[in-house]
């Protein structure tokens, strides 16, 4: 992944978004662009640790008067609550309505994901 991302960046690609590993992976951001190695799972029945959630990436690209591009990135962890496959963002607030085992998995995913991404 890193070799491919490096190759693409050297050849002018500014924004790279990966998804296949089914788990959230680190990202890189600098003045030349953003590499999101994996967004994890958005809607999935995979319930293994780290496979039961993902991140929503909001990227804003603006062009400066000199023609250069600027990138801003906002990452929002989300967790898939089953049954029903409800996407549950990190700001859900009320986890008390979740079954205890779901609440524990939700909190573990959010804690681990925030640590991984430095949020």
Functional labels for PLM-detected ranges:
Residues 52-119:
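A short C-terminal boundary segment appended to hydrolase-like catalytic domains
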Residues 1-55:
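Conserved beta-sheet core of the metallophosphoesterase superfamily
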């Amino acid at each position: 992944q890193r070799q491919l991302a490096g190759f693409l960046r050297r050849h002018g690609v500014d924004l790279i978004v990966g998804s296949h590993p089914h788990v959230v992976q680190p990202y890189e951001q600098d003045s030349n662009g953003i590499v999101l190695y994996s967004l994890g799972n958005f809607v999935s029945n995979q319930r293994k640790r780290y496979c039961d959630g993902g991140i929503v990436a909001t990227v804003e690209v603006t062009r400066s008067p000199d023609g250069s591009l600027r990138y801003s990135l906002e990452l929002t962890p989300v967790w898939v609550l089953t049954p029903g496959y409800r996407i549950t963002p990190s700001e859900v607030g009320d986890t008390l309505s979740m079954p205890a085992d779901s609440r524990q998995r939700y909190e573990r995913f959010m804690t681990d994901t925030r640590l991984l991404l430095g949020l």
